[in-house]
């Protein structure tokens, strides 16, 4: 695991000197404290910081192939590198190390850009191909490893694992995208390919990009190609028992291949279904007790430590845990530094702390991320199915009936009923997006006044429309994998673990497992009110019954309580500051109304208030010359 960065001349002009690349790499030392390496030509420069997990002594980067004409830096892990190495050795390639990175370099020399589809793992890759005079960038299928890029000055494109690598380039004057700010409040994150800065993007998952500089001021040749796609059809036709056996085998293999490591490792254990299954499968392949790490809260409705302890005891793990209290919100500045752009998921706090806990004992962990998207585990999938049943049963009259009921009922019940009516009146996929949005159009008007987006879902709507999938239910799974999973869950895990120089591997997002699970009939994912139907059948072979019936909690923190008590002074100081008011981003009367509604218990505004604090804290970290674009 590493962090990478680099520059390329787009039109043949000279690049900044080596000190610029060194400065870019220094910003991501936390991603790779063990080693640094760089390579320069007159038209391209690449660098890396390394966290040594495989071939600790011999895995220095950049790695080379084709007599040094190919130079590669890489962030991630490749789990099939040994099989790939055997194939390449049979074709005459001689290896100088036992690292997975050298396999990628030789695979590129042999297969070109076709090599990326051969890699089983997580990665962001940069290759300087001197024979073709091109830079090639690539990102893994699901987007576990990040890669930002953009033109930082005329004729110079920069890229890196984190936005802070680009901020280290002298002369770049970032400009805030106010469209992205509103997306942040609608969704809780900024969806790819956009970022908080205008002109800076993210290479989409499952894509590679080739950049060939132009000559003498000419235009560059830039090609972006998708090399991976998740197919939901045709569906498997095996009987349920056979599919259960196949799922067990895929899960077990996904865990097994991720246990290759030359350093100590463990696992996150929340006590929920996904992480418990991962830990149970890990113990099948280990001869020593597994190290597990859990986080909890004093507030009973949010605390999963008793559940995690029961699973740890059942599996015989060496268990470590800690409790998160309101003073953990003091981590906000640290989190903002590591996320680089506004990130609204408050579960970043416990994820950061459990990563910090784990990093005291191990250098790598397995996590349970991805199970909800793959097997329809979130409650919102059940809620959406319920909305569709209401719509069918009322022959389309439900929106009007719900709005009428909302007008007649007082307080929170009326607001909820009105909200249901509004969603029932929306077309696909806005009816689903409105269900999961953190801020609805009325909230956006409170936050931004007349400048609020007229179309809050425009940046993600098309991700939920796939003509090759014949049901809205599975278009939702596909869309969530392409948006929420990539830009919220995986961003959260990457930044919080890497901030602590800890590698996280997600076996439930193994490409083979995804390919298998996508083609399962949907009623083996969500059956009635039970999500993860077939996954639970497998889990029943590994875990106590109480884990299977436990209500899903997620990793949420008790923001509503905290903002009414311990965090209230911090909130009031933030929104009352002169800098906050002078920025002119928010409608001040609307912000005050949000605070009043929350403090008086009229509505839970905890998530929106948290995002207000995140954005303001992030704004205070920016260079003085940074300016926001006008809102449209």
Regions found by a protein language model. Give the residues of each.
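Cysteine-centered catalytic environments shared across enzyme families
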Residues: 1-339, 351, 355, 541, ...
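Adenosyl-5′-phosphate
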Residues: 1-4, 22-23, 168, 198-204, ...
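Short beta-alpha connecting loops at secondary-structure transitions
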Residues: 166, 294-295, 341, 385-393
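Glycine-rich loop motifs involved in handling phospho/adenylate chemistry
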Residues: 265-274, 299-300, 346-349, 374, ...
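Alpha-helix capping and helix-loop boundary segments enriched in small/acidic/polar residues
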Residues: 299, 323, 342-345, 392, ...
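Short glycine/serine/threonine/alanine-rich loop segments
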Residues: 317, 341, 363, 485
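Short secondary-structure boundary/capping segments
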Residues: 336-338, 379-386, 628-630
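Active-site adenylate/phosphate-handling loop in enzymes that bind or generate adenylated species
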Residues: 353-412, 484, 493-513
């Amino acid at each position: 695991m590493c962090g990478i960065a680099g520059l390329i001349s787009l039109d043949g002009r000279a690049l900044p000197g080596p000190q610029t690349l060194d400065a870019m790499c220094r910003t991501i030392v936390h991603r790779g404290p063990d080693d640094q390496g760089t390579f320069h030509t007159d038209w391209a420069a690449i660098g890396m910081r390394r966290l040594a997990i495989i071939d600790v002594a011999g895995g220095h980067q950049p790695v080379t192939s084709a007599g040094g004409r190919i130079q590669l830096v890489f962030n991630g892990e490749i789990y099939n590198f040994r099989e790939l190495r055997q194939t390449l050795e049979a074709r005459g390639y001689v290896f100088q190390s036992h690292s997975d990175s050298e396999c990628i370099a030789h695979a590129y020399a042999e297969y070109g850009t076709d090599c990326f589809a051969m890699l089983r793992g997580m990665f962001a890759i940069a290759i300087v191909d001197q024979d073709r005079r091109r830079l090639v960038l690539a990102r893994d299928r699901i987007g576990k490893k990040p890669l930002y890029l953009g033109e930082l000055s005329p004729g110079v494109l920069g890229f890196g694992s984190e936005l802070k690598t680009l901020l280290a380039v002298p002369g770049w004057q970032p400009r805030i995208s106010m469209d992205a700010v509103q997306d942040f409040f609608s969704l809780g994150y900024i969806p790819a390919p956009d970022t908080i800065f205008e002109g800076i993007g993210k290479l989409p998952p499952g894509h590679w990009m080739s950049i060939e500089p132009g000559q003498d001021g000419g235009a560059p040749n830039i090609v972006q190609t998708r090399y991976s796609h998740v197919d939901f059809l045709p569906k498997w036709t095996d009987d349920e028992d056979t599919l259960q056996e196949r799922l067990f085998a895929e899960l077990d293999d996904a865990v097994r291949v991720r246990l290759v490591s030359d350093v100590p490792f463990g696992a996150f254990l929340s006590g929920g279904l996904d992480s418990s299954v991962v830990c149970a499968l890990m113990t099948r392949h280990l001869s020593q007790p597994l190290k597990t790490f859990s986080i909890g809260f004093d507030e009973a409705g949010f605390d999963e430590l008793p559940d995690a302890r029961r699973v740890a005891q059942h599996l015989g793990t060496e268990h470590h845990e800690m409790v998160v209290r309101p003073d953990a919100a003091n981590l906000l500045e640290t989190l903002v530094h590591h996320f680089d752009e506004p990130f609204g998921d408050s579960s970043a706090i416990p994820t950061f702390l459990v990563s910090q806990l784990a990093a005291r004992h191990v250098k790598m962990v397995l996590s349970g991320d991805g199970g909800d998207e793959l097997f329809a585990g979130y409650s919102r999938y059940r809620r959406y199915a319920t909305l569709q049943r209401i719509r069918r049963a009322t022959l389309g009259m439900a929106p009007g009936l719900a709005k009428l009921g909302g007008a007649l009922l007082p307080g929170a019940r009326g607001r909820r009923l009105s909200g249901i009516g509004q969603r029932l009146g929306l077309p696909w996929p806005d009816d689903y997006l409105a269900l999961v949005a953190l801020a609805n159009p009325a909230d956006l008007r409170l936050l931004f006044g007349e400048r609020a987006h007229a179309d809050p879902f425009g940046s993600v709507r098309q991700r939920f429309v796939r003509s090759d999938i014949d049901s809205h239910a599975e278009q939702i799974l596909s869309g969530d994998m392409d948006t929420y999973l990539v830009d919220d869950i995986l961003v959260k895990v990457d930044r919080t673990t890497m901030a602590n120089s800890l590698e996280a591997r997600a076996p439930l997002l193994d490409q083979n497992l995804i390919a298998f699970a996508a083609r399962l009939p949907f009623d083996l994912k969500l059956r009635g009110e039970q999500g993860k139907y077939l996954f639970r059948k497998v889990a029943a072979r590994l875990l106590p019954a109480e884990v299977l019936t436990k209500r899903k909690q997620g990793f949420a923190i008790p923001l509503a309580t905290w903002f009414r008590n311990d965090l209230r002074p911090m909130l009031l100081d933030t929104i009352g500051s002169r800098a906050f008011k002078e920025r002119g981003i928010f409608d001040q009367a609307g912000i005050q109304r949000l605070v009043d509604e929350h403090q008086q218990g009229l509505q839970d505004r905890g998530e929106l208030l948290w995002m207000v604090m995140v954005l303001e804290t992030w704004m205070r970290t920016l260079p003085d010359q940074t300016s926001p674009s006008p809102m449209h």
